[in-house]
Amino acid sequence: MIIDSDAAPAIRPPFWRSLYAQVLLAIVLGVLLGWLAPDVGAQLKPLGDAFIKLVKMIIAPVIFLTVVTGIAGLSHLGDLGRVALKAFGYFLAVSTLALIVGLFVANVVQPGAGMHIAVADLDSSHIADYAKAAHDQSLVGFLMAIIPDTLLSALAQGEILQVLFVAILFGIALSLVGERAQPVTDLLERLVAVVFRLVGILMKAAPIGAFGAMAFTIGKFGLGSLANLGGLVLCFYLTSIGFVLVVLGIIARIAGFSILRLIAYLKDELLLVLGTSSSESALPNLMAKMEQAGCAKPIVGLVVPTGYSFNLDGTNIYMTLAALFIAQACDVDLSLGEQISLLLVAMLSSKGAAGVTGAGFVTLAATLSIVPSVPVAGMALILGIDRFMSECRSLTNFVGNAVATVVVARWEGQLDREKLKAALG
């Protein structure tokens, strides 16, 4: 929920009027409807899709305006390069750690051991589209895709990295022009206020979107679909929770704040992510709340959007854990060298994964298509439960990017500790 920092303190509204309570109630009602009337629940997918489309509609202008005004406000352009270097260094270190955690847990718990699945018996027709999407991915193709065909096409298509690329160039140009560009900067600052007010309006529909998305998930896949492969789902959830509380918790403590207080501060957004299974649905609110928590606008504008492509801790845990699950289920014994190769490939293929529903599955397909030891057809084993793991991936990704923003802001000396303390309580 967007809060106008300039507004006078208001009387605290009743609990039931908060976005947190409304989204939570919507999720519960969606689960009940999908369970009691699955045919009806399965028809409500458009509600969730429509809400995500509404949010995606506003993501491009939010990123563009925030990044441009943030860069234009930098005293020295050298600051931009330094912030980017620190951010990507953090992304690489923590993402690699997440991959290692997934690999370690899979080796210790061995969730796929004893299934003895013959690859020839698997029906891989359902993963053909994912495999094709993965095959189309390449490092060169990914880098070329960052450059839009035109300046306007980046905003029109809403690709996050393209919008970020254009915004950085535009912000640098404004900074180089200097005082003559001040009227343009002032106009963009006013547009930022308008766009975030629009975000607040769109968030009113969040409970409807969460209700439809959850009713569809339970209605189509059913609660019972978790039974056969529940071990993998439970293992992934516990691993992700442990990663957030222990790994990110330690990082947060070193940076001078509590991970639990940060999670409580972002509870509205986390419920929104849970209901829609998309961390993108809460991106505009995350940027606003990180600024309110004392992180400087240039830091927020650079770290949050890039983190949505390069700092996906939940997706990284999922990839190595799921890959080893498939190998174990198909009785493929991976040597240490093969597991290291898997980790290195996953480090590359995970970069650029979008924060939308199902992107983690495509990224896994991209990884397995490069690693010959693990059969891509084995992905058919987890296709039915991937939707249930998507929520956890998105939540972990979201918290990871919030932590990254505060950490980079602290490294840069661009963190208002008093604001952070007041926000987190």
From Swiss-Prot:
Main location (coarse class): membrane
A cellular-component GO term for this protein: plasma membrane
Any one GO biological process: L-aspartate transmembrane transport
Keyword Transcription regulation: no
Keyword NAD listed: no
Protein's membrane topology: Multi-pass membrane protein
Superkingdom of this protein's organism: Bacteria
Record field: transmembrane: 18-38, 54-74, 88-108, 137-157, 158-178, 198-218, 232-252, 317-337, 365-385
Disulfide bonds: none
Keywords linked to the UniProt accession: Cell inner membrane, Cell membrane, Membrane, Symport, Transmembrane, Transmembrane helix, Transport
GO-annotated molecular function: fumarate transmembrane transporter activity; malate:proton symporter activity; succinate transmembrane transporter activity
Signal peptide positions (record): none
Pfam families for the chain: SDF
PROSITE patterns linked: NA_DICARBOXYL_SYMP_1, NA_DICARBOXYL_SYMP_2
Location in or out of the cell: Cell inner membrane
Homology family: Belongs to the dicarboxylate/amino acid:cation symporter (DAACS) (TC 2.A.23) family.
Role according to the record: Responsible for the transport of dicarboxylates such as succinate, fumarate, and malate from the periplasm across the membrane.
Name assigned to this protein: C4-dicarboxylate transport protein
Species assigned in the record: Rhizorhabdus wittichii (strain DSM 6014 / CCUG 31198 / JCM 15750 / NBRC 105917 / EY 4224 / RW1)
